[in-house]
Structure formats: C-alpha cells, structure tokens
C-alpha cells in the first residue's frame, strides 16, 4: 500500500468508527475489491446490518466469506454465525462449526464457546458432551457441562 492508500484506508476506517457508514462503505469498497480482508469484513458488517444503507444479504455474505477465506478471524467467526443462524445464507450447522473452528484456531475464545455450545446442545453437529467439555475448558470455563 502506498502512503496515499494508507491515508485513504485510515480515513475509511475512521469513517466506520465514527458511524458514517455510507461514507465508510464508499471508501472501503475499492480496498475490499483489491483483497483487503479488514475492508471486506467491515463492508460485510455494514451490508449485514443495513448501516447507512439498505441491508444486502448477498453482499454481506460475499464480503464476509472473502475476508474469512483470507484467514480474518473475526470474519470467520461472523461467517460461522451466518451459517448457524441462517442469516444471509442457508442455515448449515456443519459449515458453522467449520468456520467457528477456524476462528477458534486463531484464538477466538467466543468461537470456542459457541462451538462448545453447539456440541453440548447437538445444534448443527452431533451432540458430544465430552467434546463440549474440552472446548469449554479451552475457552477458560472449568466447570461447564
């Protein structure tokens, strides 16, 4: 990234943080199209929640998946929830578990906890209380299940 690009990206992130979402989307879009995972993730959030514009499930999924496939842990977690809840994409517990596991492998404790709950409840995966206990323990909960 050039100095100008750094300044533009910083401005786009500042617009997002200031909740100027329509402007942020416009500024983040070129970076997302160039493969910037953080820009892709932020755009996904804007489209998924209809922030500053009409909600767009197709674009929310497109950008969340693009960022997740690049290894962006928060996007992997977000994509896991999309699949778990059937939001922006068809509900798919196996896919949810796969993306939560990828995020958990990068240290996302929330993904570990969600995965543990899935195994505890048999939600989208086969119920496995032993696996649920193991995951809860990894997430820092000693007395769960």
Task: List each model region and its residues.
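Alpha-solenoid helical repeat scaffolds
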Residues: 41-42, 77-78, 93, 110-114, ...
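Alpha-helical segment of the N-proximal tetratricopeptide repeat
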Residues: 4-34
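Canonical positions in the second alpha-helix
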Residues: 30-31, 65-67, 102-103, 138-139
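Structural signature of tandem alpha-helical TPR/SEL1-like repeats
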Residues: 17-26, 54-63, 90-99, 126-137
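Short helix-capping/linker turns of helical repeat alpha-solenoids
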Residues: 3-4, 19-20, 33-36, 49-51, ...
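Hydrophobic face of amphipathic alpha-helices that form TPR/SEL1-like repeat modules
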Residues: 8-9, 14, 42-49, 53, ...
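Helix-adjacent hinge/juxtasegments
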Residues: 62-63, 69-71, 77, 81
């Amino acid at each position: 990234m050039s100095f100008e690009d750094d300044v533009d990206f910083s401005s786009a992130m500042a617009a997002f943080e200031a909740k100027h979402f329509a402007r942020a989307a416009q500024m983040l879009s070129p970076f997302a199209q160039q493969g910037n995972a953080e820009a892709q993730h932020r755009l996904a959030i804007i489209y998924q929640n209809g922030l500053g514009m009409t909600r767009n499930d197709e674009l929310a999924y497109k950008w969340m998946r693009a960022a997740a496939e690049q290894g962006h842990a928060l996007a992997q977690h977000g994509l896991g929830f999309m699949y778990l809840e059937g939001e922006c994409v068809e509900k798919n517990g196996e896919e949810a578990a796969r993306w939560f596991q990828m995020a958990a492998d990068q240290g996302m404790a929330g993904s570990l906890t969600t995965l543990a709950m899935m195994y505890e409840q048999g939600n989208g995966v086969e119920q496995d209380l032993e696996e649920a206990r193991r995951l809860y323990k990894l997430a820092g909960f000693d007395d769960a299940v």
